[in-house]
Regions:
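Alpha-helical structural signal in soluble globular domains
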Residues: 42, 85-89, 137, 196-208, ...
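Alpha-helical recognition/docking segments in bacterial nutrient-uptake
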Residues: 2, 59-173
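Short, well-structured alpha-helical segments in soluble
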Residues: 107-121, 228-244
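Flexible loop/turn connectors
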Residues: 234-356
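Hinge/beta->alpha junction and helix N-cap segments in small-molecule ligand-binding domains
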Residues: 68-81, 99-107, 160-170, 186-234, ...
Length: 356
């Protein structure tokens, strides 16, 4: 059936005008909630909603709930860029995007309910909100809701998140493939997502039949800052004999990697000639002190786009099965990791040509 005939059929059965039905199916803002509901129900009953709504977002107002720091680029550049990706994904649609700051845990439930029960709120995206009570309330309200980089432990809400465990495993596996065996992981374990990365790193150790010893292979940072990691690595170098130093550092974030590199350089160690450094993320710092970082990129910019697409599908098929979309990371090989050849010493790193 052609689009024109579909619109005419829906208009006939709902008693609405052709122009109203067309505006609803196009996701236009100048339609009432009552009209939108009638058109959606009729289109669904006729079995034409999915075909007609492809590429459209059948709502006019969306709220993004996120920790307060997510709205400040200097406080949390990762979440800030995720929000930008949500904005970009919504550009083709006439959707009013609003924001509400919530704590990750122990969030203000009354504030959340007030925003969710606002007649202008048709759907929500929850970015990095771990509070299980908020997840319960989101289910009770019943409006379409998608989680980003967090999870509903009761498995009721759809989610989009990086595959943190696989990302951690992939990063560690690359270092092993480059010949490294003594790898020190510098991680902040403040959130369960970082624990998942550590679990993946342990998986890589196990795949190599190596024993992971936290006293030798893990430095736990208090935060994700460059200053904290620099101090941590500096103290480690002061307390560790030169013969016992690792061949590589696997660092769990951009700014942490910057701090780690600075700590190594302050101690007179070169990257990667003396110690290799690999990062997870590395979107924000392409080069640190002229050292282009090898890294596994977390799929930051894809999170917003995929969340909007998932929300679109929930609007079309609200009774569809609920699940979590795990996004893979991407390995970006640059110059901060050297290859170690077993039994032949390290592969030399030369920045000058043979005849320079």
């Amino acid at each position: 059936m052609s689009k024109k005939l579909q619109v005419a059929r829906i208009a006939e059965q709902t008693g609405l005008s052709l122009s109203t039905v067309s505006r609803v199916l196009a996701g236009k803002a100048n339609t009432s909630e009552k009209a939108r509901r009638r058109v959606r129900e009729c289109a669904k009953a006729l079995g034409v909603l999915e075909d007609m709504a492809a590429g459209r977002l059948l709502l006019n107002s969306l709220v993004v709930f996120a920790p307060r720091r997510a709205f400040d680029e200097r406080s949390d550049i990762f979440y800030y860029r995720v929000i930008q990706s949500i904005n970009k994904a919504l550009e083709p649609h006439e959707v009013r995007l609003r924001y509400c700051a919530l704590e990750e845990n122990d969030a203000d439930a009354n504030l959340f309910l007030a925003r969710m029960n606002d007649p202008q709120t048709e759907a929500a995206l929850l970015l990095g909100i771990d509070d299980p009570h908020i997840h319960d309330l989101a289910c009770d309200v019943g409006k379409p809701c998608v989680l980003i980089n967090c999870r509903d432990r009761k498995m009721r809400l759809p989610a989009v998140t990086p595959d943190h465990r696989a990302i951690g495993e992939n990063a560690a596996r690359y270092l092993f493939e480059m010949g490294h065996r003594e790898v020190l992981n510098v991680l902040c374990l403040r959130r369960y997502t970082m624990e998942l990365r550590l679990a993946g790193i342990r998986d890589a150790w196990e795949a190599q039949n190596l024993a992971f010893d936290e006293t030798r292979h893990l430095l736990t940072a208090p935060d994700f800052s460059a200053r904290g990691s620099e101090a941590l690595v500096t103290r480690f170098l002061e307390e560790t004999p030169a013969a016992a130093l690792p061949g590589a550092l696997l660092v769990g974030g951009d700014f942490m990697a910057a701090g780690a590199v600075k700590g190594l350089q302050n101690a007179g160690l070169r990257v990667p000639q003396d110690i290799s450094v690999m990062s997870i993320d590395a979107f924000n710092l392409a080069a640190i002190e002229d050292v282009p970082l090898t890294a596994v990129h977390v799929p930051r910019d894809a999170l917003g786009e995929e969340a909007v697409l998932m929300l679109q599908q929930r609007l079309i098929r609200p009774q569809a099965a609920v699940g979590t979309l795990l996004l893979n990371g991407t390995l970006d090989v640059r110059e901060s990791v050297r290859r170690v050849r077993p039994g032949r010493g390290s592969a030399s790193v030369q920045r000058d040509g043979l005849y320079d």
